[in-house]
Amino acid sequence: MANMFLMFYLSMIMFLFGCMVFVSNRKHLLSTLLSLEYMVLSLFIFLFFYLNFMNYEMYFSMFFLTFCVCEGVLGLSILVSMIRTHGNDYFQSFSILQC
């Protein structure tokens, strides 16, 4: 029982560290995507232990992982298209107002 709460706290601390890195490191798109994936991994760990603790089925974790993979693929496709058009992945060279 205490081990389960330790895992809950560990996943929450991982999520908070991921949020801190996401907010503080805004220079490159790749580092931002990596911090987002770290946050998703910590949420998956929290979800896994929560579902095990409550004796629920693991079907929702499959859907969660599927959407996380889709999010990662979309982020990488944006990164590749940004590098092709601008030559780098700096946020300073990318403007949303440009077409």
Swiss-Prot record:
GO terms for biological process: ATP synthesis coupled electron transport. Core subunit of the mitochondrial membrane respiratory chain NADH dehydrogenase (Complex I) that is believed to belong to the minimal assembly required for catalysis. Complex I functions in the transfer of electrons from NADH to the respiratory chain. The immediate electron acceptor for the enzyme is believed to be ubiquinone. Coiled coil: none annotated. The chain crosses the membrane at residues 4-24, 29-49, 63-83. GO terms for molecular function: NADH dehydrogenase (ubiquinone) activity. Its main location: mitochondrion. GO terms for cellular component: mitochondrial membrane; NADH dehydrogenase complex. Keywords: Electron transport, Membrane, Mitochondrion, NAD, Respiratory chain, Translocase, Transmembrane, Transmembrane helix, Transport, Ubiquinone. It catalyses: a ubiquinone + NADH + 5 H(+)(in) = a ubiquinol + NAD(+) + 4 H(+)(out). It is a multi-pass membrane protein. It comes from Anopheles quadrimaculatus. InterPro entries: NADH_UbQ_OxRdtase_chain4L/K, NUOK/Mnh_C1-like. Its EC number is 7.1.1.2. Belongs to the complex I subunit 4L family. It is found in: Mitochondrion membrane. It comes from the Eukaryota. This is NADH-ubiquinone oxidoreductase chain 4L.
